[in-house]
């Protein structure tokens, strides 16, 4: 399920004044209008969200919440109601549900929709995202195999030395009671070993839940992020025993982790602190973090990490500032900031070291940017399906693979930014890793209220 939710701050509201003014003018000419400058709802908390994937020619389901019971609502785009002649009135819970027919010729992208309320008066704006329609093709280029694992899969990482796939999972919000680290045979996808992380002694019914994962083949370890504890941990590859659980609040909302094994370093993106945390993988000590500095005023929130070990560069993308960051690992500092025009909610990043290309996937705008690292220029803006979350570069086959989560697809892109395949890949793919031998491992994290449901890993092999 993909949710586009209204989130309007006072700082952003002035950007929408002209849109709101137009809506008010239209509304005053209708029965909806109460007159100019009637009593306004100064505590207005109404918001509207669209549910599911919306494409040209489809029908959108809209949900309103936080309105005053009995409040009348218009939803306007270019001065026209997007729900036709429907009269929207908030029920006793301050909510409503409505349908909107999306024209077949609607442009894909984010469309600002004005929320014009009356009785009492208020106005705001939400973005309605119309995603591209996608077709399945290129299936004959791949073999595909899937196997059930456990609930709540997040990421996987392959160990060339051990020839094993390590998969992490966590279910629900804190307190998290279900989380696992799995050792998987990459050929058969059979689970060979599994453990549940230790209980957190400071939080009732909560374990040190696992989210991000990377392997250290030099020291025989697995590094994981324990996001809910703002920390990281280290486990043995051999028996999955705990080597070290770092203290809480070591890495603010730790998201991804990557290991530069040859240089005894691990790097974790600190989503909540605008920095990349650094660790010595041999001594298991924390080192000074690398600060990320945006071109704008907001502090960046780094998401995915992509390591170019040969050139000693690390790349990350900030979900809130529309930027990618280049880190010089020799100097242990930020080297460059790359602006990402036409994107929102960037989350996935992958580097092609030899080609000096960077790929950035953005959930909010359904696109992947292909960037020339030598010039910093955007080579191509590639529209994919709804909600591209993560991306990985497969150097063997010279293809970037995108986990298009909301569409349940994986898209393969060549170095020209052309889609060479778009594959059905199970429900809600969350992450993709590669073994460097032409095998891609897709982990699925499908929302389900069924406690007996399990998510799966899919192996894609390039023929």
Segments from the language model and where they lie:
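Gram-negative bacterial Sec-dependent N-terminal signal peptides
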Residues: 1-33
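Predominantly soluble domains enriched in secretory-pathway, periplasmic, or organellar proteins
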Residues: 34-463
């Amino acid at each position: 399920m993909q949710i586009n939710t209204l989130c309007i701050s006072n700082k952003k509201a002035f950007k929408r004044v002209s849109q709101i003014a137009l809506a008010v003018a239209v509304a005053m000419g209708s029965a909806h209008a109460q007159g100019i400058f009637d009593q306004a709802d100064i505590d207005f908390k109404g918001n509207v969200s669209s549910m599911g994937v919306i494409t040209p020619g489809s029908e959108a389901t809209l949900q309103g919440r936080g309105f005053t019971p009995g409040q009348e609502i218009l939803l306007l785009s270019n001065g026209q109601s997007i729900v036709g002649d429907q009269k929207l009135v908030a029920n006793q819970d301050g909510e409503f549900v409505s349908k909107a027919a999306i024209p077949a010729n609607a442009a894909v992208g984010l469309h600002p929709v004005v929320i014009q309320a009356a009785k009492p008066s208020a106005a705001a704006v939400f973005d309605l995202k119309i995603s591209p329609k996608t077709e399945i093709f290129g299936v004959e280029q791949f073999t595909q195999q899937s196997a059930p694992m456990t609930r709540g899969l997040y990421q996987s990482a392959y160990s060339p030395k051990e020839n094993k796939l390590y998969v992490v999972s966590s279910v629900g919000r804190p307190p998290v009671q279900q989380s696992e680290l799995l050792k998987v045979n990459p050929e058969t996808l059979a689970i060979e070993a599994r453990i549940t992380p230790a209980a957190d002694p400071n939080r009732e019914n909560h374990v040190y839940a696992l989210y991000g994962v990377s392997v250290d083949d030099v020291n025989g370890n697995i590094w994981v992020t324990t996001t809910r504890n703002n920390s990281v941990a280290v486990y043995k590859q051999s028996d999955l025993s705990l080597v070290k659980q770092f203290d809480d609040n070591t890495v603010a909302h730790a998201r991804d982790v990557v290991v530069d094994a040859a240089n005894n370093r691990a790097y974790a993106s600190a989503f909540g602190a605008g920095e990349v945390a650094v660790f010595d993988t041999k001594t298991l000590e924390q080192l000074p973090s690398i600060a990320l500095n945006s071109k704008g005023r907001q502090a960046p929130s780094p998401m995915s990490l992509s390591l170019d070990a040969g050139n000693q560069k690390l790349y990350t993308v900030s979900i809130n500032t529309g930027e990618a960051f280049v880190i010089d690992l020799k100097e242990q500092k930020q080297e460059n900031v790359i602006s990402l025009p036409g994107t929102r909610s960037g989350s996935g990043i992958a580097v092609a070291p030899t080609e000096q290309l960077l790929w950035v996937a953005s959930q909010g705008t359904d696109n992947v940017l292909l960037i020339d690292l030598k010039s910093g220029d955007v080579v191509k803006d590639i529209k994919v399906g709804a909600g591209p979350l993560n991306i990985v570069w497969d150097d063997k086959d010279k293809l970037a693979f995108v986990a298009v989560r909301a569409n349940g697809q994986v898209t393969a892109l060549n170095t020209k930014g052309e889609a060479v395949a778009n594959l059905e890949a199970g429900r809600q793919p969350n992450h993709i890793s590669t073994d460097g031998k032409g095998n891609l491992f897709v982990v699925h994290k499908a929302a389900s209220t069924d406690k007996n449901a399990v998510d799966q890993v899919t192996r894609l092999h390039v023929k």
